[in-house]
Amino acid sequence: MEAYGKILLIAMPAFLLLVLFEKWYGWRKGFDTVRNMDMISSLSSGITNVTKDVVGLYLIVLSYPFFLRHLALVEVKATWLVYLIAFVALDFAGYWIHRLQHVFNFFWNGHIIHHSSEEYNLACALRQSISGIVKTFAVFLLPAAIFGVPANVIAIVAPLHLFAQFWYHTRHIGRMGFLELFLVTPSHHRVHHAINPEYIDKNFSQILIIWDRLFGTFQEEQKNIPPVYGITRPVATWNPIRINFQHVWLLIKDAWHAHSWWDKLRIWFMPTGWRPADVAAQYPVYKIVDVYHFEKYDEGGNSFFATWIWIQMTTLLLLVSYLFANIGLIKSLDSSYIILYGIFVFIYVYAYTELMDRNKYAPIWEALKAAMAIGIIIYTGDWFGASGFVSGIQYVLIGWFLLSFAITVWLSKKEQGPTELSAAH
């Protein structure tokens, strides 16, 4: 937990700088692929994902060390070859997990957030799920466990393998020659994120494209078929927390409304997007039919509104950085404070992304955020030990949360109506 938090203190600013560089580069080249609100939504999703992992808001079932203890045929040392084997094993497992997430209704809920952006850029790589409360990833690492790959090797290689998937989420890099034969490139992954009929459910590989070539899911990017990004049932929100549970909520409602008990049971394991015929007829859900002519979810708003949202997210990044840098200190004050801090981060994200959506309940969420934060400060006399670093910081934070609430109420009244839509293509 603490080690991962320290890694993120380096990774987060690095990713943010690369995202901003892509925005600047696209602007300079006259090919801007990054919209402000979409980028903030993506970054906010990344914040919720890493916060969940750092504070431990999940349950691991059948962990890798369990399989290693019971299935390892040999005991091996952590040599460079073992690290290489671990990397390949993780990549192989990643391919099949990724494929399952696309194929079955229930598993799609854990991946929908990653495809929810209607753009394709570095920021959308940070759209990672928070809906997976129970982790069963280790089941797919059985080959590594059988061959005795040490658990600490997996622990080191896993985040590196994840971070290595960031760079190819861009439209600014074309074909890459011979590398296209064995590595996942931006061209390959653009196909994967596309909703064109020719591209959908292709290129599941994460680092080595060889898995798609071996298992029949490979598709080249075609010059005459420009990829169109997003999902066929658009999420129509900037709120990453709502996106994370939008699909499973639809499944729950469909299962409830279905007349057939067989449909109520099988809906969870049917192909992604399947709905009982009677439910689909009675409760239709919008789905994109022509991918070249649909309306993108757009931010609208003026420059002050956009600036305010940026200020909100930047302030949250500072608060999250404090959490990651001081996990040990916060736990020493009270072990429950880590979970409390994590819940606060989620409410913070929910509040300002509801404002981004022009949701009329945004001030209520902002009030809840302010009440929770000020309540923590009044009850403990501090902000999780922060006054030991900056004297009086708790009073500054009280002022900030009150100001934030006031401006949110003002903007909610000023920005009338739902977010406007603009033509996509």
Language-model regions: role of each:
Residues 15-24, 88-103, 161-174, 185-191, ...:
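Transmembrane alpha-helical segments that form the membrane-embedded catalytic/substrate-channel core
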Residues 119-124, 167-309, 361, 397-425:
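Cytosolic/stromal cytosol-facing helical appendages immediately following the last transmembrane segment
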